[in-house]
Amino acid sequence: MTAAILIFVTCILPGQVVLQAQDPDSRPSESKWPTHGWAKAKPSSVGLDEKALAAFDADLASGKYSLVDSFAVIRCGNSVFEKAYSHDYGTIYAKEAKMRGPLNAHLTGPYNYFDPAWHPYYHGTDLHSMQSVSKTVSSAILGIAITRDDFKAGLDTPLLTYFDVAKVKNGDDRKRRITLRHVLTMTTGLDWNEEIAYDDPKNDASLMEATDDWVQYVIDRPMAHEPGRVFNYSSGVSELLAYIFQKETGQDIEKYGEKYLFTPLGIKHYWKRTPMGVVDTEGGLFLNTTDLAKIGYLYLHDGIWDRKQIVSQDWVRQSLTPFTDAEEGFKYGFKWWLLPRTDRPGYIWMARGFGGQRLMVFPEENLVAVFTGWEILKDETPDRDLVNRLLPAVRTQTCAAAP
């Protein structure tokens, strides 16, 4: 994921990536920053193949790529394609909505994933469940707090600093060695099974959401590995971010994000909370499609928005560094998925969520793509299949019109 605004260069040390700073003159003019809405342009005017996008749109509408709710493409600061696809989820999941199970431990409310009042859209609005894209946005808010020196602890601070150790089960020396860095990179070593389907009663994420105290459920898990050695995807570990943020800063992560991220970028949102009132940083955020694109655009511009440094370039660089091998051929940074490119060195940056939520950033093409969906009982479309439909639509490496 050369005429980019932001270029992902080669690794110069194991795990370290250098980002080439963008030329300030190449950034959008103030009038084009999409705080209050994206400027519109035809795909061909920014070097995209309109027929290729139209064919992809037709396949999305046909259901070839599962239950997709929306698709948007941003290139060179312009919205060149936005489309919503309608599905009657009340009918599609009517049977499941009436049966108690791992995805609807409560027959109504925010943690029944078949309740059409809550999923995929929040109470009839255009705010769509982001699921695990929430993790990536939470990482951005943490980065802002570090940038502003409101979060003072270093990333090598032990996780148990924020807990009464006497009340933590399964304590051993390995658990004492878990740090905030391990939380960000999914390498805590905690025993956690989220590889099986979410409607499987043995899935730890579903088990956690059926409890009242999610944070306690997570921190009480036994250890399976030495911290820092094994990537193990864990929604529970990501839920700890909200708790840690409150303990370290004395502030609520949603309210902080409202002030320093959502408002400056012009993003409207809703964020679910756990039964204990903790912000659901593992999967509870709701955004609309084009507002989600703003998160990718912020990172595409080194954390700068409308000529203001919202999150430091250093945090952006670290977030997009491939610290560990992950699943499905991905690398993993600070809550960002990094898909190795097959056509050149570098990565496509992604935020990924259950049901088909995808934020994709192609830095070398100056392109951001967003998908939302609600395919929650079947396998989602592989990310490379979507990438392989998007990249052929790019006709020019610059923002020049397609020939």
PLM regions with names:
Residues T2-Q16:
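Bacterial N-terminal signal peptides
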Residues D49, A54, G77, K83, ...:
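Active-site SXXK
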Residues A61-Y121, N366-V370:
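A short, well-structured edge-of-sheet supersecondary motif
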Residues K83, Y93-W118, D156-L160, D199-E226, ...:
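Short, charged, amphipathic alpha-helices and their helix-cap/turn boundaries
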Residues W118-P120, G124, S129, T147-L190, ...:
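Active-site helix/loop module of the DD-peptidase/beta-lactamase fold
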Residues S139, V237-I244, G283-I304, Q357-G373:
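Active-site-proximal alpha-helical segments within enzyme catalytic domains
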Residues K268-H269, V316-V368:
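Active-site Gly/Thr loop motif
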Residues A351-P403:
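Structured C-terminal helix/loop/strand segments within mature extracytoplasmic catalytic/sensor domains
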